[in-house]
């Protein structure tokens, strides 16, 4: 029997395993794909978000603020490509100017330091390729960029060096209460037992919760498409550039990547399953 079984070997699951293996615990990582970082952890913007956006008082706000320095620390320890380049949220007109003020106030409530509100002229001094139509910007100096799949792979390797076991092609189909813990069954008939379970299943976390008899939320999956430009364009901007956020998310961003490319996107199209990775 393992002390802890972690379902999902994405960036959250592998970093959780890495942290738990600092202690005298037996840890098992269960992944339904044939390797780590095969879900959202290999297909995202690679942004270390500054923490100004979450609703103050929520768990997300608390963990974002605490998580930023921890993520930079993990990147240094694991030698993962990462840069504290800062971010800017741009406003175009009076209505969006007011949103910038709201985001700044929200960031202050969340305990985020190193923020500043810039005029359009001040923003263009930092980023010469910004549009003349930019009227105001929120500068967030603690934000950054990281290679998410490199982080996931490195965290998994470190956890395994510390004694964690990784079991791939392990699609969880049943979770049964057992004596002193849980029995976790896979589609191909394998089983493990663990005293505690941690659900890190990403886009499938609601399905795992339902299997465990703890259905209290639903994930509505969205797929995003990006344009990845050549490294010759990587210095077009130095900060991660956001629009003001909407109800659907942070919108289209423009950012250098940790590997020196320029990334544009993502879109946010609703799909019927997190496994739908078709492009249009």
Could you describe each region identified by the protein language model?
Residues 18-19, 69, 78-83, 199-280:
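Active-site substrate-recognition segment that forms the wall
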Residues 56-65, 90-99, 138-157, 167, ...:
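Short beta-strand to alpha-helix junction loop
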Residues 46-126, 251-252:
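Dinucleotide-binding Rossmann-like beta1-alpha1 core, especially the glycine-rich loop
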Residues 5-7, 192-204:
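Short hydrophobic core segments
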Residues 21-43:
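Glycine-rich FAD pyrophosphate-binding loop
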Residues 138-196:
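Helical element adjacent to the flavin cofactor pocket in flavoenzyme catalytic cores
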Residues 2-29:
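N-terminal Rossmann-like FAD-binding beta1-loop-alpha1 element of flavoenzymes
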Residues 12, 35, 204:
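Conserved Rossmann-like nucleotide-cofactor binding loop
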């Amino acid at each position: 029997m393992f002390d802890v079984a972690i379902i999902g070997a994405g960036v959250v699951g592998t970093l959780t395993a890495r942290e738990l293996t600092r202690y005298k615990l037996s840890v098992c990582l269960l992944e339904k794909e044939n390797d780590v970082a095969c879900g959202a952890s290999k297909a995202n913007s690679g942004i270390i978000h500054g923490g100004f956006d979450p609703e103050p008082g929520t768990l997300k706000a608390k963990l974002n603020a605490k998580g930023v320095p921890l993520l930079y620390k993990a990147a240094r320890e694991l030698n993962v490509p990462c840069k504290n380049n800062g971010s800017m949220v741009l406003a175009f007109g009076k209505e969006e100017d007011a949103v910038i003020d709201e985001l700044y106030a929200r960031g202050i409530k969340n305990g985020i330091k190193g923020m500043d509100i810039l005029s359009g002229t001040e923003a263009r001094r930092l980023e010469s390729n910004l549009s003349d139509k930019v009227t105001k910007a929120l500068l967030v100096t603690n934000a950054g960029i990281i290679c998410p799949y490199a982080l996931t792979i490195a965290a998994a390797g470190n956890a395994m060096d510390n004694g964690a076991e990784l079991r791939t092609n392990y699609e969880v189909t049943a979770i049964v209460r057992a004596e002193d813990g849980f029995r976790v069954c896979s589609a191909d008939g394998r089983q493990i037992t663990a005293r505690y379970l941690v659900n890190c299943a990403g886009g499938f976390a609601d399905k795992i919760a339902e299997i465990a008899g703890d259905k209290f939320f639903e994930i509505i999956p969205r797929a995003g498409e990006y344009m990845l430009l050549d490294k010759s364009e990587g210095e077009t901007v130095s900060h991660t550039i956001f629009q003001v956020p909407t109800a659907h998310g942070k919108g289209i961003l423009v950012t250098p990547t940790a590997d020196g490319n320029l990334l544009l996107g993502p879109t946010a199209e609703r799909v019927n399953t997190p496994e739908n990775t078709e492009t249009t």
